[in-house]
A protein has these predicted regions:
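Structural motif
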Residues: 63-65, 130, 184
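Feature marks short, surface-exposed loop/turn motifs that line or immediately flank catalytic pockets
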Residues: 70, 137, 166
Length: 188
């Protein structure tokens, strides 16, 4: 269901604003496809919890893709959140928004983003960490790099950068310099 909804949603990219007129794709029949599961012979787990609640679980690799700006994920993707949680929240507003008070991410505020990354790197019980971020995030590349180096085994921290096209309603954007960043380290 999570994979099918975006192909029929009457939106431009986020669920907090719907199109005024019905887009052609919203008339498509929603196809539910069984996801292909490839066994690697290991005991894998996928968790749907706040990151702070799972830092004490052992794992080989922790992959984190936290918000990198002040726009909260929950209001922009509230339909997908409701599907993932399979709950029945009280809805409000024209777009049927769920109440997300008390769930705002510390990664979405410049004053708390450093303090959100610190426990992620310090307290997790994994061998490797891979963080997806971008060079225009609320925490600077230098700050996040120094924090990663603080918790990395010597000479294991790497920062990879890739050019990234800014999404602006299918209109090419002339502003250059947006980079997708992957921070990789082996934990001490």
């Amino acid at each position: 269901l999570l994979q099918a909804v975006p192909y029929v949603a009457n939106i431009t990219g986020v669920y907090s604003a719907y199109l005024k007129f019905w887009d052609a794709r919203s008339y498509h029949i929603m196809e539910l496809k069984k996801p292909e599961i490839i066994s690697n012979g290991k005991k894998n787990q996928c968790l749907n919890e706040d990151y702070v609640q799972v830092l004490d679980k052992r794992c080989d690799l922790l992959y984190a893709d936290p918000p990198y700006n002040s726009r909260e994920y929950l209001p922009n993707y509230h339909i997908l959140e409701t599907i993932a949680r399979y709950d029945y929240p009280q809805l409000s507003g024209v777009t049927g928004m769920r109440n997300y008070q008390g769930q705002k991410s510390a990664f979405c505020r410049k004053s708390t983003v450093y303090d959100a990354f610190e426990p992620l790197l310090r307290d997790c019980r994994c061998r490797y960490i891979l963080i997806s971020y971008n060079n225009e995030g609320l925490i600077s590349t230098d700050q996040l790099s120094r924090l990663c180096e603080k918790y990395a085994c010597e000479h294991t921290f790497c920062l990879f950068e890739y050019d990234y096209r800014r999404y602006k309603n299918k209109i090419p954007n002339s502003k250059e310099g947006l980079k997708e960043q992957l921070y990789f380290l082996k934990r001490r």
